[in-house]
Structures are given as C-alpha cells and as structure tokens.
Amino acid sequence: MKKYRDLLGLVHYLNQSIEQGKTIGQKKLIKIGDLLKPYIDSYNDKREWILLSNASVDENKNLIVDENNAYKYTAEGAHKRDKELMDLFLSDFDYTPIQINSPSELDQYTFLYGWVNGVEFTIEPEEEVEL
C-alpha cells in the first residue's frame, strides 16, 4: 500500500530529475514514470469526480462555470470538495513495486526507494547538526 501524497511527491522528484533525458538514468526515469501512469490516472480520475460532484449547478442542473470554464462552488460545496480532496490525497492505494532488471545508473535516485525493486540505493547517513 502507498499513499497518493507519496505518489505525487515521487512524480515531482521524477519530473525534477528527468531534465532533457540525456543520460541512461534519466531515460530509465522516464520509463518508470510511464509505468506509474495508471496510478496517476486513477488519482486524477478520482480527483475530477470530486471536483465535478461538488460543483454548483443552476435550477436546470447545468454546471455553473467561470470565464476560464472552471467549476464554481458554493461555500458549502467548496468546503466539502476540499475535505474530500484532502481525504483522497491522504488515502492509500494498492501498489506493486516496479521490478528493475537493469538497475545501472538508478542507485543515485534514492527517492525511488520503496517504489522499485532490484536497485541497491546509495543512501548516505545524514549528518547530525547541533542547534
């Protein structure tokens, strides 16, 4: 089990690390990102459902949208939407770690720890800092 908040953090780190995809490691990160896509799509589908379910409608049940075509919300709808979005963000989902058969150049990307199998990560202990 993983949490969606951790998945979104992983996606952030992947995007920051991929850059132009110039190295073998960066190309492998792109492939890992592709394998994570079904989990990301599931989160986005659930998120969109929450946004839609709490949007304001007029007397004819038509969605009320702003000039940017974004949903509008009543104060109550916005509060309910925000609570449901936070619940989703903190919720668990079933996750099977990605098996890596050729781990070269991935050991430096320690943010993958727990998300992939087959990589020996080089995790250096943090230095203690006196305050």
Residue ranges and their predicted role:
Residues 1-131:
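A composition-driven surface/loop motif
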